[in-house]
Amino acid sequence: MTLQFSWVASANSAETDFPLNNLPYGVFSTDGLEPRCGVAIGDMILDCRAAEEAGLIDLGADPIFDVPFWNEVMEAGHDTWTTLRARLTEILAKGSKDEVIAKDMLVPRAHVDLHMPFLVAEYTDFFASRQHAQNMGAILRGAASLPANWLNIPIGYNGRSSSIVVSGTGIHRPNGQTKAPDAEMPSFGPSKRLDIELEMGAIVGKGSDLGQPITVDQADEMIFGYVLLNDWSAR
C-alpha cells in the first residue's frame, strides 16, 4: 500500500500506527472536553464533533457527532461510512485547504482518556480459527482434532456485552464453584486460572430487519469496522 501523506507531520513517520491510510475511530475526553467522537491521525486525534460544528463534516440535515458514541454513524449505513472516510482523508491530506481550520481541532493522544467507541448491543464469540480449534482439541481430547461440526456450521458463543470494556480497565477475577480432584463437594471462590486470547472483532454496523437473513454477498456492506479484543476466560 502506498503511504498517503498528511499535513499532520507525525502521521508520515515510518513508526506511526496511524498514517492517513489508517484512520481508526474512537471516543475520547480531556480535562476540558467531555467524551466525544474522534479519529486518530499520527500522535493526534481529530475532534469530529468540533469538525462537524465548524461545517468541515456534513453527513446530513441533523448532527451525527453530537453524541459520545459511533452508533448513529453505524446506523446510517455503508454509503455514509464511505462518504465520511473520504471526507476525513480529504481534510487531513497534505495540501488540504481545510488545514487552517482543522489544525485547531487536533488533540494530542497523550493527553486524552479513551472510552468505549460505541454501545455494544450484542457480543458473539466465534470459534473461527482452525489452528486454535485443533489446539483446543489436543488440550481437551488429547489429539489435535476438529470438532465434528467445525467444517460445516459456525460455532459461536453468546457473550455478555456488558463485560466489554476499553483497554486499560482493570479485570475482576471471577468467582465460581470448582471441585478439587480429592474433594467430595465443590467450593466457591475466585478462579485460580485465567487465560487470554487475542481476537479480532467484526463490528456489525447497520442491522437487518427481523427475520431477514444477511447473505454472504451483503456481509461487506454490513461490517462497520474491526477491533482487537483481549478475550479473558476463567478456567
Q: Which positions does each model-derived feature cover?
A:
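Active-site microenvironments in enzyme catalytic cores
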Residues: 4-30, 40, 46-235
